Amino acid sequence: MKLLHLFTTASILLLMATCSKKDSPAPSPTPTLPGCASIISPVGGSFVTSTSVVLTWSGVTGASTYDVYLGTSSSPTTAIATAVNGTTYTHTIPSTPNITYYWYVIPKNTAGAATSCSATERTFTYIVINAPASLGYYVVGYFPSYRSLADVPDIKFRMTNVVVYSFYQVNASGSLVAPSSPVASLTAVATKAKSNNAKILLGINDGSGDGKTNFKNMASTQSGRTNFIKQVMNVVRSQQLHGVDVDWEFPSTSDGSDITFTSLIKELSDSLHRDAAYYLSCAVTAGKYAGGIRDAIRNEIFPVVDFFNIMAYDDFSTSTPYRHHSDYTLATVCLNYWLTTRDMPAAKAVLGLPGYGRPSGITQSNTVLSYRSILSQGGNSQLDSAVVSSGGFSNYTIYYNGQYTIKRKAKLAKDIAGGIMLWEKWQDAPDGNSLLKAACDTVGRSY
């Protein structure tokens, strides 16, 4: 009886053990340890201009969530977000500019295990891009490197609030070329401008024979634009200038340079306007004639340029007599086009004035005279034409702007635009017949 009991008990235990082995689930496999994510953006020492930064990375096989680390020193140890589903995370950074941030992502599997991924760290810098403060009514005067500073008294610098040193030239690769033998150096003109409370801008034009090929070639590639902007910023900073004037004559829709001009101006503006540090101006065509040249100035650059020097002159003819190259009517036509037709902000439209005269119906070679030279030959400061002799031509009529017309144009610009520009300072009369004096007196600018 005892033997039967023992046998029965053993059978039951064996059966229970057998059932237990069949009913127990197999152990779960260990989750795969995920690799590191590739940082997508922001990356590579890039700049961001918003305090709301979208951090983006690649998905990783075996990762169920991601922890995001960010800080202001390398290999940050503080996670700004944990268990993030997906591959983006928006983070708000402080509004203090010029701070560099370091960041990386740690993918985690379902068990919460991860690989150290700090080696994938990338950086970005928060910057502020804003235009510097407007100067109000602009009175811009160009000063060519081939003129003598001794011939232009301090008062002429006080009459202007912007002086443009003209010109450095650009070559096809984007390098800047300073004047080889300047009568007046950039440093000397900058010193005189600053001592008379004027901003000093570096004027840049094209070093090629046609005045546009080097700009066109440089701007056609990202490397060319980058090199150009780097060189521009080096000169602006080293010479302690207040900005840059771009004098590309002219980009055009006919060859696609309008597209690369737009890219160049936007990229240059971003560099100059960082921390609202420097001004950017552009010389633009008068706008009287329809076509690819005036259409090349796209409206999308209006917000990124501080002011436009509208070249409302040189509308001459070598075959038709009695034609003024820059009368009052041309000024109204130009401003109407840029302000009304094109919607250029009025405060940024600067009306160009000529400090020289041109003949009509004959060659322009050696017959163009400065305003001061016209007066020295008996021209009247209150009129717009005179009989002069020059370049082998005797007693021909030259057309210029006297004080009366300059006053009218200055008032027009005061009423509907943002200021005036004179090409160029040396050509003006040094005394009471000065065109700049007439303009300043008209608009109430003290000097």
Name every feature range the model reports, one short phrase each.
Residues 53-62:
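Conserved aromatic anchor
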Residues 127-236, 323-328:
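Glycan-recognition patch characteristic of GH18 chitinases/ENGases
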Residues 94-114:
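Beta-strand-rich modules
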Residues 109-128:
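Extracellular fibronectin type III
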Residues 3, 13-45, 125-135:
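Bacterial Sec-dependent N-terminal signal peptides
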Residues 210, 346-416, 437-447:
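Glycan-binding loop/region signatures in secreted carbohydrate-active enzymes
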Residues 80-86:
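Short beta-strand segments within Ig-like beta-sandwich modules, predominantly Fibronectin type-III
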Residues 140, 172-184, 230, 250-379:
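Substrate-binding surface in catalytic domains of secreted glycosidases
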